Amino acid sequence: MISKNKITEIFCIADDFCKELEKEFAKKVLPDSDNASKRHRKRMMSDAEVITILICFHFNSYRNFKHYYLYCVRTVRKDLFPKTFSYNRFIEVMPRCFVAMTMFLKLAVFGKCTGISFVDSTCISVIHNKHFYSMKVFKDIATKGKRTMGWYIGFKLHLLCNEKGEIINFNLTKANVDDRNENVMNALTDKVFGKLYADKGYISQTLFGRLWDKGVHIVTGLRSNMKQKLMPLYDKIMLRKRSVIESVNDMLKNVAQIVHTRHRSLHNFIMNILAAMGAYCFFSTKPHVNFYYEIPPSDGQLVIWQ
């Protein structure tokens, strides 16, 4: 179970960010036309508390959020959360923190691009295949997609991380969207530079040229039916280190609970994914590549020592 010190750390970071975010929002509010008085009564629980509870859920052994909220947050951790909503009210309020949660991840806890990045996608199954035609929550939203283990129904999470194992960016799409999709790659590689290592599913001359123009050099392996070509030694070494992004996906699924089939609304499904990625950013151990690098000021060329 997560310690009190860790919960306090997450809450303090989230609370400081939410206060700054509210100040920025207050500067951008449009003036009222009717000059009518508005109520500004605060909720019993702040956005920071909701974000903290959602993130801490992925640190515990509870496999059901309702049990976690009722028997952990409102009982065991009552000293940390003295004023809490009922479970039904908490579920209603949760989607209202979507903007704050997304901004918190993007601006406060996600990592930065260092010039060495890894990209991959993982499947997010939301329902068993045999229940596809009786699906209600994700009707007309979830689609069929194919993975190495066969067909599944749900979505696809595209992730970008650096060599430290820190998530840089993400994109959630339907299951039948190609990894090389132009919109997906443009969103993922925004503010990314340097080398981008990917698997053979990202082989595309069009994608290579488009990223090259943005200052990103995508490096992939070669298929068996492709003509062999020379590749720098450090690129070959870094392609073998792609297990970093695979380990990130594994921790999101097995340590956190980014995949399960108990969703009752689309909003809470998205909040669960955001909370899982937020929890991963606070994990004490992350997969990483053991090497040292520097960029000499003389020529600006990236130098790697394995």
Predicted stretch roles:
Residues 1-306:
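Short alpha-helical elements
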